[in-house]
């Protein structure tokens, strides 16, 4: 028995949702006006001539801080449904959630020791 036929709606949705952005990019590339020149290579700064060097380096400290924030934000998303149904799920789910929180605490201690949480 081939069980993938039960998921034909999912495969059709996956195919359409994959082809739509590709089709949109191809249509925009085909219909976009082609204009090359030195004005296209300059950086846009609110309609005003760029003052100084517009290409600045992005500090990696901001990236690390944002990455740690996203990790803890995702942790909240995963723990919220568990907290809402805590009384129904039982002790095994409590142990699994405790292990999950313990892994995240170890990760946050590691990030703290590496200095990812310091803003200076």
UniProtKB/Swiss-Prot annotation:
EC number: 7.1.1.-
Bilayer disposition of the protein: Multi-pass membrane protein
TM ranges: 7-27, 64-84, 88-108
UniProt keyword terms in alphabetical order: Chloroplast, Membrane, NAD, NADP, Plastid, Plastoquinone, Quinone, Thylakoid, Translocase, Transmembrane, Transmembrane helix, Transport
Molecular-function annotations in GO: NADH dehydrogenase (ubiquinone) activity; quinone binding
Cellular component annotations (GO), alphabetically ordered: chloroplast thylakoid membrane; NADH dehydrogenase complex
Catalytic activity annotation: a plastoquinone + NADH + (n+1) H(+)(in) = a plastoquinol + NAD(+) + n H(+)(out); a plastoquinone + NADPH + (n+1) H(+)(in) = a plastoquinol + NADP(+) + n H(+)(out)
Compartment(s): Plastid, Chloroplast thylakoid membrane
GO biological process: photosynthesis, light reaction
Gene3D superfamilies the UniProt entry points to: NADH:ubiquinone/plastoquinone oxidoreductase, chain 3 (1.20.58.1610)
InterPro entries: NAD(P)H_OxRDtase_bac/plastid (IPR023043), NADH_UbQ/plastoQ_OxRdtase_su3 (IPR000440), NDAH_ubi_oxred_su3_sf (IPR038430)
Function description: NDH shuttles electrons from NAD(P)H:plastoquinone, via FMN and iron-sulfur (Fe-S) centers, to quinones in the photosynthetic chain and possibly in a chloroplast respiratory chain. The immediate electron acceptor for the enzyme in this species is believed to be plastoquinone. Couples the redox reaction to proton translocation, and thus conserves the redox energy in a proton gradient.
Subunit structure: NDH is composed of at least 16 different subunits, 5 of which are encoded in the nucleus.
Family: Belongs to the complex I subunit 3 family.
Protein name: NAD(P)H-quinone oxidoreductase subunit 3, chloroplastic
């Amino acid at each position: 028995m081939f069980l993938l036929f039960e998921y034909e709606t999912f495969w059709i949705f996956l195919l359409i949702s994959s082809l739509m952005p590709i089709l949109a990019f191809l249509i925009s590339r085909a219909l976009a006006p082609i204009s090359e020149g030195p004005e296209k290579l300059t950086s846009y700064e609110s309609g005003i001539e760029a003052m100084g060097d517009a290409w600045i380096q992005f500090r990696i400290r901001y990236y690390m801080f944002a990455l740690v924030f996203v990790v803890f934000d995702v942790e909240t998303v995963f723990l919220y449904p568990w907290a809402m149904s805590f009384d129904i799920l039982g002790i095994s789910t409590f142990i699994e959630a405790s292990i999950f929180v313990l892994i995240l605490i170890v990760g946050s201690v590691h990030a703290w020791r590496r200095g990812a949480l310091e803003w200076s």
